[in-house]
């Protein structure tokens, strides 16, 4: 009988422990290798308390500035932006129980300054954007999650009217379509989104039937995101601190420009600024874009026609906001600041889209990218 009751007590204890753990989620932060940064930081987020606690740091001195998780959640990939002429990428195994990382392998990105990495929805192919090299590189994912050598690479060409920033190609991001049939590659210099059809099994790409979409010269395409309904898409225009809106043909992948150079800065801001990152809440009601200089998140309401109407600006409580994260449940926004070495946490009103600073500022040297694991 005592054994029976002991077994019950152990079972209840384990259930309570599991329940407590379920309120905590794993987050990963990519950084530049300056000011004492160790590389990639792993945090545990307590949703009830609204706090982040560090649980691991992974040594990587080559500026693992941007991160992406495998669809299975079992692997994580980072760029190694570094100062090397030819950049690199790294693969890590994820301990599903703890969220901690173990290094698997690295590969060349076949281009300098890799700044963005993404994984297709089958988990078979990784796309790397080489900012310095002006190219897109495609790598296969092996059965154990490690990266194979590059199987494809596309070199862009051209210049733009901004002679300081658009002097040569600068590929800035590669974003997968919701149906996983196309990848959209932003080049800051050519003011184009280049569109490629994907062969995920072979880890190859080829130009789509409509091979690109253009925005106003000098705008500087950076990051790109899709509306949850897949009908609309939105582009950060870094150099003009604006955003562009597109409709999308699901069959051909072609984009049609609906709005261009929509202002994102506060009306009273007159200083220097470049826009950085862009995300939409899971309900498809609100869009947010980060501004470096103004140090704000611009907040837009999304209409039924996909068009944007600005509803506010939120100071980010830090300097140089780069990547940011809307948590999957839509309750919080986390903002990574490159120059104030912190991540700030905001509570989000899902009805109005407005943000409230929680007072939580988490120290991370040269924070650039923040993502959350699917658990």
Predicted feature locations:
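Asp-box/WD-like beta-propeller blade repeats and closely related beta-sheet repeat scaffolds
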Residues: 99-173
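Beta-rich, blade/repeat-based domains predominating
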Residues: 36, 61-72, 110-122, 157-180, ...
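A short beta-strand motif characteristic of beta-propeller blades
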Residues: 53-59, 102-108, 158-164, 208-214, ...
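Short glycine/acidic-enriched loop and turn motifs that connect beta-strands
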Residues: 33-36, 81-85, 132-135, 190-192, ...
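Blade-loop segments of beta-propeller domains
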Residues: 54-123
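Bacterial Sec-dependent N-terminal signal peptides
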Residues: 1-24
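Short loop/turn segments immediately following beta-strands, especially the blade-tip
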Residues: 43-50, 92-99, 138-149, 196-205, ...
